[in-house]
Amino acid sequence: MDQGLSLNTLPLKELRNLIRNNQFTGSTTGCAAGYLQANLVILPAEWATDFLLFCQKNPVACPLIDVTQPGEKYLQSIGRDIDLSTDVPEYHVFYDGEFETAVSDLSTLWREDLVTFVLGCSFSFEEALIQSGLSIRNIDEGKNVSMYDTSIPCQSSGKFSGNYVVSMRPFTSIDAIRAIQITTRFPKAHGAPVHFGDPSLIGINDISTPNYGDAVEIKPNEVPVFWGCGVTPQNVIRQSRPPFCITHAPGKMLITDRLSSEFAVLDSRHLLLLPNLIIRAGMRINCDMGESFGLCNR
């Protein structure tokens, strides 16, 4: 199948069948508008408790949707027809923390001791941004979202430690404010941004070269806005070195049967004023950038 084909209007069941039959292996950004998309982390049961606690301690980077019992391939909470071993466009396989290979299904790798964690994804709030009149650059350019390793530390838990990975979308200052307001409603899709403005403040030295995904144009009147990202566990896995782990490939998500709106916590009519919103979201704000938005006073 042509990976450049727009799939926004394709019914979810048809899209899932394409993925299951290895006919679509591309990024799912912009696909199945309005449906919750999810990251996957699959670990041996002996590592599962520590990772569960890691997710609980780091809900922005790893917003937990659900977790399976060992060996289970299905989760009724996210979809009656979803097979966790076939319904992701591409999986990444790690041994001792090192990436080994990419596969399109897990039939030869599945084990009865494997526990699957389903984590929320920022692709889930894309439709809300678009419905509010905002443009998402990577979708407009037909690309995967830009993702970066950072210097922002996660809270450690047992065997697991490491730094955030973030996704980036550029906006004008006015649109950035609106994007912050909208995405705060979706904590299970990473919620409000963790940073905007100068990327070097979070350890990104070259914004034109993402660690994952694709580079997009950032116009002179735009600022980069950074959200927590479900690729964070892959960064953590490289440091924590479990003997075996499977994840989704960055930008190639599990699309669930649940609507993103089911996980919204705040009606858009009742959004707080931005200064209070930022305080409550605990955002990292570059005050120089904040001054240009009228948010910071020295």
Curated annotation (Swiss-Prot):
Enzyme Commission no: 4.2.1.-
Domain of life: Bacteria
InterPro entries found in the cross-reference section: D-Glu_cyclase (IPR009906), Putative_hydro-lyase (IPR038021), UPF0317 (IPR016938)
Annotated SUPFAM superfamilies: PSTPO5379-like
Record keywords, A-Z: Lyase
Gene3D superfamilies per UniProt: PSTPO5379-like, PSTPO5379-like domain
GO molecular function: lyase activity
Protein family membership: Belongs to the D-glutamate cyclase family.
PANTHER family in the cross-refs: D-GLUTAMATE CYCLASE, MITOCHONDRIAL
NCBIfam families the record matches: PRK05463.1 (NF003969)
Entry protein name: Putative hydro-lyase VFMJ11_1458
Organism: Aliivibrio fischeri (strain MJ11)
